[in-house]
Amino acid sequence: MYKRQNLTNAVERLREGVQAYQENPAKIIRDGVIQRFEFSCELAWKTTREFLLDQGFTELNSPKATMRKAFSYGLIDDEQAWIALLNARNQTSHIYDDATAQEIYSQIESEFVSLFDNLIEQLKRG
């Protein structure tokens, strides 16, 4: 439950960052949103892993393995979207150009925040 609350707080900070960038599209704000995304992503898979371990699952040694199991368990409903989110997270470690950073930001705004929101709702029900 503690991790779930941390995840909820992190996603709220991410949402605040997205709103700030919409109001003032400065690169420094966009980069802050990407940092918040990285943190939210880490909390999302680790919180999901903890939940699944509590359900008796094992072999959850990576983010992708964890989210695949979350899909088969019914905790998330779009496995491919979560794999895309994890791939974007991995890509953030290697951003060297504005175009890539902007592309990842756009995915955060249009897709990834809602994936986090849906996961949080499912974890509350679980």
Residue ranges and their predicted role:
Residues 3-126:
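Solvent-exposed interaction patches of small proteins and small membrane subunits
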